[in-house]
């Protein structure tokens, strides 16, 4: 049988990578790395009005159970090694969402000697959510953009990028 006749009969034709991407994007377990005032907006998004749980986004207390880290707030030079350690403890595939001007590029404290000018200097970031602080709706939109990115992302190409990463430790 050809694929158009199967689709007419109610069958869905997809690849295994597409199926896994769809399942994974619908069940993001996130670790909140709240460093400043943006973390308050992150709490608003998880509360009853917006209810992130209905999208399948479940908070985790340990990085070993999480596949998404939401970095919210000002990242200082002293906190950067701890954030990298937490990121390294997350299982593959892992994603990072940078929330707010301070996490994106240093924000108000950009010229301070103690601030990292963007968390993307420490960990690879998949989605940036702008604002100071960004609203809960902006965070939800950013998470939906990450879901769409996971659905269309080719897992094989992502693995190849990880293998070519300069920070990659040899096995």
Swiss-Prot record:
EC class of the enzyme, as a word: translocase
Record function comment: NDH-1 shuttles electrons from NADH, via FMN and iron-sulfur (Fe-S) centers, to quinones in the respiratory chain. Couples the redox reaction to proton translocation (for every two electrons transferred, four hydrogen ions are translocated across the cytoplasmic membrane), and thus conserves the redox energy in a proton gradient.
Keyword NAD set for record: yes
Requisite cofactors: [4Fe-4S] cluster
HAMAP family xref list: NDH1_NuoB
Catalytic activity, EC: 7.1.1.-
Residues annotated as binding [4Fe-4S] cluster: 37-38, 102, 132
Gene that encodes the chain: nuoB2
Cited NCBIfam families: nuoB_fam, PRK06411.1
Keywords: 4Fe-4S, Cell inner membrane, Cell membrane, Iron, Iron-sulfur, Membrane, Metal-binding, NAD, Quinone, Translocase, Transport, Ubiquinone
Domain of life from the UniProt record: Bacteria
Protein species of origin: Chromobacterium violaceum (strain ATCC 12472 / DSM 30191 / JCM 1249 / CCUG 213 / NBRC 12614 / NCIMB 9131 / NCTC 9757 / MK)
Protein name, per record: NADH-quinone oxidoreductase subunit B 2
Membrane topology: Peripheral membrane protein
GO BP term, pick one: aerobic respiration
UniProt-listed SUPFAM superfamilies: HydA/Nqo6-like
PROSITE patterns in the record: COMPLEX1_20K (PS01150)
Entry note: cofactor: Binds 1 [4Fe-4S] cluster.
The reaction(s) this protein catalyses: a quinone + NADH + 5 H(+)(in) = a quinol + NAD(+) + 4 H(+)(out)
